[in-house]
């Protein structure tokens, strides 16, 4: 089963001085909220029979690829609600926030650092998930209501 995480985004491993939450850039939100109507629509796809399951939760964004359980555990200590870790979502969320554009981040969970066969989990991902990812994204976009 492929999991897709989407929803709120929080930067991690950035300290921007006193008066800011860990990961918060001065003058900007600590957490970028996903657009509620887009999130609701995305979650409704779970009822369509898609092969992929969609989950909503916090995405922790950083500046490196996480390859081991120690790094993942450190992130989870800072952000216990974290569903996924990536390197892109916060930058996209911040840009959308600054320009007033509705935001939602679809993330495919490609691997879980620290589990047995982590490397093959990641390698197998590229051969099996492209089509399913496209189908999920296409279904999401093609079924968006006109009023969004």
Please provide the spans of the model-predicted regions:
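Zn-dependent metallopeptidase/amidohydrolase metal-coordination segment
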Residues: 92-124
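Predominant activation on well-ordered alpha-helical scaffold segments within soluble catalytic domains
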Residues: 43, 90-93, 97, 134-138
């Amino acid at each position: 089963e492929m999991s897709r995480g989407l929803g709120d985004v929080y930067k991690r491993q950035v300290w921007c001085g006193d008066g800011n939450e860990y990961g918060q850039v001065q003058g900007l939100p600590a957490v970028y909220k996903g657009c509620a109507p887009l999130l609701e629509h995305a979650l409704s796809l779970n009822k369509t029979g898609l092969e992929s399951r969609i989950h909503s939760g916090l995405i922790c964004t950083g500046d490196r690829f996480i390859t081991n359980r120690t790094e993942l555990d450190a992130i989870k200590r800072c952000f216990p609600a974290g569903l996924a870790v990536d390197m892109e979502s916060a930058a996209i969320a911040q840009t959308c926030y600054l320009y007033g554009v509705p935001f939602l981040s679809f993330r495919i969970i490609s691997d879980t650092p620290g589990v047995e066969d982590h490397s093959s989990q990641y390698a197998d991902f590229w051969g099996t998930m492209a089509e399913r990812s496209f189908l999920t994204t296409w279904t999401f976009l093609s079924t968006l209501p006109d009023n969004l």
